[in-house]
Amino acid sequence: MHENLPPINEPLASEKITMDRKVFFLDLKENARGRFMKITEDVGGRRDTIMLPNAAFREFLEAFARIVEFESKL
């Protein structure tokens, strides 16, 4: 871990997206095993979360872009 990191459990960076009744949180975090993104969907207090290791960021983003491009052509 690095000296200038926020306290444990605090995200290194965070984004919040609100769409209708849903709120999405994207938190970049770090622990002893490395950096990861915690993606949380909150719908009326019910939360679902996935953890994405930083080694998968680029592949995830590329797959996401392909889906967005495909959907735009429908």
Where are these regions (language model features)?
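Positively charged, low-complexity terminal tracts
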Residues: M1-L74
